[in-house]
Regions:
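Basic, Lys/Arg-enriched alpha-helical interface segments
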Residues: 1-71, 80-83, 91-118
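Conserved Hanks-type protein kinase catalytic core
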Residues: 77
Length: 118
């Protein structure tokens, strides 16, 4: 069985992950293609374990994509049933994941949990 992939949308209906990937496609087609492949594999459960995916603690995981020297991360969570919600995407430039990038994902996860509770 496949997972359903949902892209986070903000309160205005904007889709920052899809917007990021569209912009990335203009500058780095290889990384964009690998990212789309990674999302497809996540849908089919092929990326739910290391080294391609890593649990970040709490309800957050990261999908790890690399193309040459470029490293991209998508932070995601699991929701009811077989749903994966992509919360945040960024280009990783240092060894350690920046705290501000994780904070964005945590904030979006909190928004989703509040919506699901209502």
């Amino acid at each position: 069985m496949e997972f359903e992939i949902i892209f986070y949308k903000d309160s205005k209906g904007d889709n920052p992950i899809e917007e990021f990937l569209l912009e990335l496609g203009r500058s780095n087609k290889v990384l964009t293609a690998k990212t789309r492949q990674g999302i497809a594999k996540l849908k089919n459960r092929a990326y739910h374990k290391e080294p391609l995916s890593k649990h970040l603690g709490s309800d957050l995981w990261e999908l790890r994509i690399r193309a040459g020297n470029d490293i991209l991360r998508i932070v995601y969570t699991f929701s009811r049933g077989r749903i994966v919600i992509l919360l945040h995407v960024f280009i990783k430039k240092k060894q350690k994941t920046p705290a501000n990038e994780l904070e964005i994902a945590r904030k979006r996860l909190k928004e989703i949990k509040i919506k699901e509770a209502n």
